[in-house]
Amino acid sequence: MVPESAPNGNSQPLPSCFTTTGVPSPSKPRVSELVLQRMKQFKRADPERLRHASEESPQKTALGDDVPRSPPEETVGENEYKLDATDSDAAMALALQQEFRREEASSHHDSLEEKGLFFCQMCQKNLSAMNVTRREQHVNRCLDEAEKAQRPASPRIPDCPICGKPFLTTKSRISHLKQCAVRMEVGPQLLLQAVRLQTAQPEVDGSPQVPSFSNNVGGLKRKGVTTKREPRRRKVNKPEAPSEDLLVAMALSRSEVEHCPVVPPLRLENAFSEKIRLGAEKKSRKKRPPVCPPQLVTQDSETTGRQIEDRVAQLLSEEAELSCTPPLLASKISKEELEPAGWRARLPEGKRNFLWELSALTGAWAEESFYTVGLFPPIVSQCPSKEPQLPLELPKQGEPSPRRPPASQSSLPVSHSPKIRLLSSSQRERQALQDLVDLAVEGLSSSPQPGSRGVPTGLDLVPSSLPLTGFVLPCKKTLKKDDSASLSLGLLVTDFGAMVNNPHLSDVQFQLDSGEVLYAHKFVLYARCPLLIQYVSTESFSSEEDGDLTQRALLSDVSSEAAHAFLNYLYMADTDMPPSLVPDLRSLALRFGVSDLVQLCEQVPAVVDLEGEQPEETSEDCESRAETFLELLRSVWVDNEEEVETLLKPELCEEERERVNEAEMEEIYEFAATQRKLLQWGRAADPDGSTNPHGEDGAVSEPSLAGVQSNRQLENTEHMESSGLEKEEALASWEQEGHSTPLQDQCPDWAGKAEAQDALGEATDDPSFCSRHRRGKECLPLHPNKAHGCKQPLPSNPRVSSELSQITVDHEEQSDHVRETQADMAQAPTPHSCSLVSQSSVDGSPSQSWLHLYHTSHLSPSVSQSHSSISRVASPRSLSPTTPTKQRRGSNIVTLRKDAGHHRGQQSSPIAGHRNRGILISPAKSPPIDLTQSVPEPLSPRAQDPLHFVKKEDEVILLLDSDEELEHTKTESVSKDSPEGRKVPEFSPRSSELFSVIDVEEDHEHFQSPLKREAGLQHGEEGQLGNQSALGCRDIPWLLCSQKTSLDEDSATDTSWLVPATPGVSRSRDCSSQTQIKSLKTRIPSDETAQQTPRPNLERRTMLETAQQFSVIMPHTQPITLGAFDSGRQAYRSPSHPYPRHHRLSSSQPSCPGPDFTRWSQKSSAPRPCLPNLPAADDVVEVGDSDDEVASHQGNSSPVLDGDPPGPMGDYCWNEPLSPIPIDHLNLERTGPLTTSSPSSQVLEALHSDDCHSPGLGTTPIRGSCGTLRESQERSSLAGSPEALWDDWNEEEGQSPEAPPVAQMLSTRTRKPDRPETPKGANQKKNLPPKVPITPMPRYSIMETPVLKKELDRFGVRALPKRQMVLKLKEIFQYTHQTLESDSEDEVQSPQIPAELPCRQASTTETCNPSRLPTGEPSHPDGDAQLPASQESMATSVDGSDNSFSSKSSSAEFGAAFEYSDEDKDEEVGVTASQAAIQAADTEEAVRRYIRSKPALHRQVLRYQPVELAELQAELKQNGIPVAMGKLSDILDAQCITFTTAAARKEKLKHKRRQPSGRKKKDQK
């Protein structure tokens, strides 16, 4: 029992057993209990038992509690245990066993390993069956595998083998490899090797590297964090890891595959694409690609070489196409040229140099071979055959007519030879017949030669074009052509002809302007016309028709027939072209570089010319229709076709065309008709008188017609003399002074003419005769050559002037012949006339000075001005027949001058003087004189010598209406009578400058010899309708015109400054009121003075001021008293002219024979040399324009005194509100002080300035004279419209039949200066070329509303309705884009600004007025003389700017405003609308000046920062400028000045808050 129990004695009951056995219990229940306990323990699991064992005591306690046991039993059990544990070995062993079991149970419960279960952490495999070593090995393997699986995650995509850049995707790696290879210049082969090595290394070294790497990674990943990340990477990378090598291989294979196909096509294109891409990526890459082509694109040297060869070939081919003679083809040459061509072709084949030599035309080879080579590329083999044939035909054509018929016969064979290539025999025959038909239709086949020629020409045009190059192919060449070759060529041509305009397989369409569509084929265009195919490729667009997309190009400006013919030539070298299509074909050929066709087209006209030689000659004689029209007009004027033939000279015709436009020609035609009637009437009135002068005039003027006209004019002159004896007396006084001394001595005929002119001066009183006489004057300018022809100077006698005027009239009729003679005379200026002029000027006789004045305006600075003013004045009349409409272009219209140089040469001669007077009609040749440039020798003999002074000034003749001319003639005669007018030429160089600027055309000078001019100017302001009388009446307008012309110097005399339409005779007095006021020479009879309107008064003032200025500039050579007739004359003359003369006269002769003039001189004061200048103005002939013309002239030009002193006169003249000529700043600058005021107003201004200025005031600053001029300008602007002007003149006439006293005139001028003459500025602006390029105005009207809002926002303007925004933007643009200089800064283009300018001018005028007011005080020089010439020019420019403003608003309105301002100061008149406008302008100007005077405020305005309106108003009030809030806002708006009323609104709101209830308001009240 014991041994058994021992092994099984793991249970506690064993001790009991042992105890039992050892100490048997006496009772049975006790044994049974033990057995049961064992059984229970055996049945229970160890853990339970263990737990129970631990709980044994409690259980036992519980059992003991539950099952009451006997105390003896319990005690026995306890004792047994105690005995076993302590005393017995068995108990000890049991305790140990129990303890061990407890530990085992606890360990087994803690970990699986202790329980004998082992699992792999990596793969979860059960390792319980393995020992510790094997388990470790297994775990290591799993770790390695895990590392291997995770390792590809880091190097998933290989780095770049070149730069080592890592990649996230294979695509990025592939693209980078190519780009990097290009950048690093790694060849494709080397790149492939690097990639392969990169992929091979992991394969070869994968085992060693991977383990090591894996070990590292494993070691890292054994950490908790790494192990967690690894599985994630494995999941992502597992699929990619196995394909890594595959991906690399694919990348490499792709690059290789791309290179192969890409290299050939991409070589040209991909290179650019790569470059572009590289450039887009990095800027540095842009530089390298051009140096080295992309490496990956270029595969090998062979491919690269081929590509280079292709490029070079392409370039060479392009050059060949562009070259006029394509490279010769050796094989073709040999074929075409049998023997000679063969060896010649061989040479080119062997050496390229031979071909070049052939192309160089060295002459080593026959022309035929050269043609063959050159024509083949464009024309293929056909060309050579055609060329030989053409040469054959050409010789035939060149042969005489008898041979030509054979040529026609041979032309068929010849045509066959060329057509051998192009057409079949039947086709050739048809073409030949067609050519004959065309020629017959054209009337070319009338003669056998043309007919014969026509056939070959049509057939051989193409070949003939080749000979045109200078090579004539031998006939043998055509003979060489075989019939078979010709047949094949004909078939080829036929086949190609079938393709012309054939939609079948057409890949190009040409759409014409008519909408017709022509079909063509690119390959034909490519082969025949590279430029056309290029045009198609660049300019074509896709059009879809019937579902097919085709290229379509637009052929504009081409007729359908011409386009068809062009395609026929391209397709089959068809040379049959109707002559009517030749121009269009030639234009197409030139457009698309078909040189052969161009040559053919040139040949066709040649044939036509041969057939019709007469028409060609006729066209040569008359180059243009305009010429023919001019000839017809001349024939009408001359009344004889023979004279027309003389006028048909090409030189004259060319000049005429240059100077005369169609509108002007029409006006001239009308004027000619009127003048004829007047001339006829004059002849009937006084045939005897006219006959005598005619003889003289005929002697003077070469053409007989001129003589006849001069006779007629003499008759008219006599009639005028009878009507104006007073004027004649004045002329006589001039003669006494020495007018005719040199002139008469040198030209007795002219002296006689001068007498005739005197008679004319008398007759000038008769308005009708005056008009005729004016016309005569106008005609005179037409005959400067004739005048020159008579080398004798013009007599100083008024008769001579009248004769000259009559001659001028005759010349008008004989304008053609006269022009021819004039050109001749201009070429050879008469020394006698020149000497005469100089002598007269030296002598200082009135007549001489007159003559000098004419010449002086062109020759000497001062004298030239006065003369030029006179001449220009006179020339305007002369021009009137030719250019009544556009006096500005009067010189151009009457462009009879031959050569400007010749004119200049004549300027030194008396003829030049006459031209300066403006008697000569043709100003075209004379160079325009720069008004600003004044010869500084006022008293020098040359300056005195009108010829010298003239300096080739273009003579402009103003065309006047019959009434105006008559009036002007009277005035001219009066002015001629006064010696003062004559003295005018001696005036300061300035006046000469002004007039020189006004350059009257040399032809005028030529037409009227200096004597004639002087006589006409001196005596013939009456007699000078043709001469100075007409000029006197029109002088101011003419001067204005001439000044403008001078402004337009470069363009020759300008007739744009024509005076507004001449009023009726009643209005104009003896002379035009303007002329009377302006021209001092012209007597200012009481009637004339009365007739003179306020504008003439202004003109006189202007002339006086100008004269004073001139006197300052030029010491008065001769004191001249202003005669009444002289003053009248000045009135008639443009202010510029009258100024110089009147000024000189006044300075030289304080007293003038004429009572009116004396009064004038007294008022103007002796120092006023301007009065003498005024006589100079008399010389100017005014041309009556239509109302429109008058209006334009009034706005544009003011009377400019050609002889006036440059500065002051310029002021007055250029302040020409009345003068029609627009004055530009440039013109003003050239003119210097010249002003373009209306003739009458300028005269008045000159007179006033003279009154204000002492005789020494000739140089008085323009400021003083400026004011006067501005006054006159104001009047002129008031009379901006012809009606206003004439009304003004009529008012003047009504005011004083006699010339108003100088004091009155000065006062008037002074008033007028008070108001700046904005219209004058406006006029100037019209013709003013912008100093800075004019920025084109954006098209605001088509802009979207958001864009408009943005534009307005730029200028700080709030959004407005679209229409208002457009208007506002346009206004802003006008203000911000000025074309004038700083002087015109204030002159914003808006009409309001012009009003402001008048204010500024008014201030300037005011400064001048004080000096003017003391008419007789020489202290005036302090006012006007204080300003230097530069200041005068500045003042002139200011006036011009003011005039420019007048253009913005009606010149009449501004003129009225100016008059009102003047009257407001000098005469109190009820406030009128014009006065209100002037006041508004003054206010606006004051506001502008105030803003400019405040730098901070000005800066704020310039920055478009809003100005507080209320504050500005308050400041203005404080400074004495009260302005209503509404008016101020309008002014600021007009100036584009942003302002705000926020402060005022806030104040109002505050005020309202303070007074919330109506009761409070009432209480306060």
From Swiss-Prot:
Glycyl lysine isopeptide (Lys-Gly) (interchain with G-Cter in SUMO2) crosslink site(s): 115, 171, 283, 649, 886, 898, 925, 983, 1349-1350
ZnF (UBZ4-type) residues: 117-147, 157-185
Domain named BTB: residues: 506-579
Segments of this protein annotated with the region Interaction with PLK1 and TERF2-TERF2IP: 499-1565
Ranges annotated as biased composition (Basic and acidic residues): 43-58, 715-730, 809-822, 967-985
Outcome recorded upon mutating residue 202 to T: Does not modify the functional properties of the protein
GO BP of this protein: DNA double-strand break processing involved in repair via single-strand annealing; DNA replication; double-strand break repair via homologous recombination; negative regulation of telomere maintenance via telomere lengthening; nucleotide-excision repair; positive regulation of t-circle formation; positive regulation of telomere maintenance; response to intra-S DNA damage checkpoint signaling
Record's keyword annotation contains Zinc: yes
Signal peptide: none
CC per GO annotation: chromatin; chromosome, telomeric region; ERCC4-ERCC1 complex; Holliday junction resolvase complex; nucleoplasm; Slx1-Slx4 complex
Protein name: Structure-specific endonuclease subunit SLX4
Native source species: Mus musculus (Mouse)
